[in-house]
Regions:
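Acyl-donor-binding surface of acyltransferase catalytic domains
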Residues: 2-16, 99-188
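Conserved beta-strand-loop-alpha-helix junction that forms the acyl-donor binding cleft
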Residues: 128-136, 288-299, 303, 315-320
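A conserved beta-strand-loop-helix scaffold within acyl/acetyltransferase catalytic domains
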Residues: 201-256, 260
Length: 326
């Protein structure tokens, strides 16, 4: 364990939600293992220079692009990094990767000071992963002093695979089947479905980006990339990949896209139930994914399958900053 890891070891786990802690006796080790690669990039100017060259903004110093350890009053600190929403250079923000500050008024106020150290990038706000969305929003909104404003970015929905397997089968389960699909074909099909959806949901690309062939390679290599069939007819794409994060182990949803002719019939839940039965899950593994709170069809589908909100990313805007649009 590095000195930085030891410093963050206990305090940063305040930001891990209760369900995650309840689901696995190894949650703390899982959390530290997930965090460590980001800690290893603190001060890594080689990595920072690579990101600088890719983004092409007039900020030359590679150390400013690397993950950074920011010292805060009262002996607190935060590991942070400059990021760009959907790789859009007009939407810079600072990611709070880990911190010794607490998820309370004092902690949020401390973290608000981080943005000044990134003035070269003109960040709009901070992004935080909070253990309980409603609590975090209430704390910020009802603070006796103005510490800023906040709104959700992405919800993290998860549940142990063993519990999901115990759920009652969806009415459409028997009509649905899955068959392996190569990444190129799956990506093309997904792109078609997203284009079709965008006509009725113009903000879709702010919520979700269609998985491309490269991003589906991992799911395919794990035999977890499928075409969804309904009564033998193509209906969409579903994919998952082993990804451990936030203190849990398990499988992250990489894609689920249902075409217009099959939407609204419970096909998504049935497809998820078929996928669950193909996961090579260990005892404490979960199925999880990120969903934007305005993406109501995806949110309803995930919750109908039994997944629950276990934490969330929020945009936190201290006074004097522009903030991130929904």
């Amino acid at each position: 364990m590095t000195e930085l890891s030891a410093r963050l070891n206990e305090s940063s786990t305040q930001w891990v939600s209760s369900p995650i802690k309840d689901w696995s006796p190894d949650w703390k080790g899982n959390y530290q293992a997930w965090l460590q690669p980001s800690l290893d990039l603190v001060g890594d100017t080689t990595w920072g220079g690579t990101i600088r060259d890719l983004v092409q903004l007039p900020v030359e110093d590679p150390s400013l692009w690397a993950n950074r350890l920011i010292e805060l009053p009262g002996g607190h600190c935060a590991v942070t990094g400059i990021r760009f929403r959907n790789r859009d250079i007009s939407k810079p923000f600072v990611d709070i990767i880990a911190t010794t500050a607490s998820p309370d008024v004092a902690g949020f106020e401390l973290l608000g000071q981080v943005l000044a150290t990134y003035r070269d990038f003109q960040p709009l706000c901070l992004r935080l992963n909070v253990p309980e969305l409603n609590d975090a929003l209430r704390i910020i909104e009802t603070s006796p002093t103005n510490i800023g404003s906040a709104h959700p970015d992405l919800l993290i929905l998860a549940r142990p695979v063993t519990e999901l397997l115990a759920e009652q089968l969806a009415p459409a389960y028997q009509a649905v089947s899955l068959r392996p699909c190569p990444p190129s074909a799956a990506a093309a099909r997904t792109f078609e479905i997203y284009n079709e959806l965008e006509a009725s949901r113009p903000q879709l690309r702010e919520w979700a980006v269609p998985a491309d062939a490269q991003s589906l390679e991992g799911a395919a290599s794990e035999d977890l990339l499928f075409e969804i069939l309904v009564d033998g007819n193509p209906a969409g794409v579903i994919a998952a990949e082993r990804t451990n994060a936030y203190g849990f182990t398990g499988f992250c949803m990489q894609e689920i896209a249902i075409d217009s002719s099959h939407r609204g019939r419970g096909i998504g839940v049935a497809a998820l139930q078929h996928l669950l039965r193909k996961l090579p899950a260990n005892e404490h593994d979960v199925l999880w994914g990120h969903i934007h709170p305005d993406n109501l069809p995806s949110l309803r589908n995930a919750q109908a399958s039994g997944r629950q909100i276990v934490s969330a990313h929020i945009w936190f805007t201290p006074p004097g900053y522009s903030g991130m649009n929904n």
